[in-house]
Regions:
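Core SAM-dependent methyltransferase catalytic element
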Residues: 175-178, 184-198
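A short SAM/SAH-binding and catalytic strip from SAM-dependent methyltransferases
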Residues: 84-97, 120
Length: 198
């Protein structure tokens, strides 16, 4: 939160809102980390399930949501068993996004929703320059003071792993989310993709 000046709170709430699911819908929070999205899902009267590969992350999950340690590329869920999926800031860590999108499509019921939030690359050259300086130079120094410097050095490099937004949307559409859309948030600092399962 310090690194984003609390903008991450706004981004997560926007992702939950754009899921646009009715109350009591079951939503998987993939790569759930400390459970921030699960908390926001509960506030929206949704029923989150926290999924993360890291037992350490799950043990620090503050949401009190049901949780499972699992690979998000091989979810321990039957086909068409959940109403929605949300994932925050994990796409850039996945090698094969098409496999991930297909797995999401497998477990979401027809008419269910997906919301994927991750870092973005601002289109405005001035904003992009400032963003590169901030995340490339300043954030790693702050991270070194607060916790793990290596993790914060990885952040700006990991952004390069994400395909262009048109590619991401096309991949989501091919996976079974025909109405998939892409929105830049905060001038492109973050990107949000949402879609409905065919």
């Amino acid at each position: 939160r310090i690194m984003t000046f609390r903008l991450d709170t706004r981004w997560r709430r926007r992702a939950v809102r754009d899921l646009a699911l009715p109350a009591n819908s079951t939503v998987l929070d993939l790569a759930s980390g400390t459970g921030d999205l699960c908390i926001d899902l509960r506030r929206a009267q949704l029923c989150p399930i926290s999924i993360d590969l890291s037992f350490g992350m799950l043990s620090n999950d503050r949401s009190n949501a049901p949780r499972a340690q699992a690979d998000i590329l091989r979810l321990p869920m039957p086909p068409q068993s959940v109403d929605g999926i949300i994932c925050g800031f994990a796409l850039r860590n996945l090698v094969d996004l098409e496999v991930f999108f297909a797995e999401c499509a497998r477990v979401i019921r027809p008419g269910g929703r997906i919301a994927l939030l991750d870092v973005g690359v601002p289109h405005n050259p001035l904003v992009r320059f400032g963003n590169n300086i901030y995340f490339g130079k300043i954030v790693p120094k702050i991270g070194a003071l607060l916790s793990d410097a290596a993790a914060y050095r990885y952040l700006p490099r990991s952004i390069a792993y994400l395909p262009d937004r048109s590619v991401l949307v096309a991949q989501l559409q091919r996976a079974g989310f025909a109405d998939a859309t892409h929105t830049q948030l905060s001038g492109g600092l973050t990107q949000l993709m949402v879609g409905t399962r065919n």
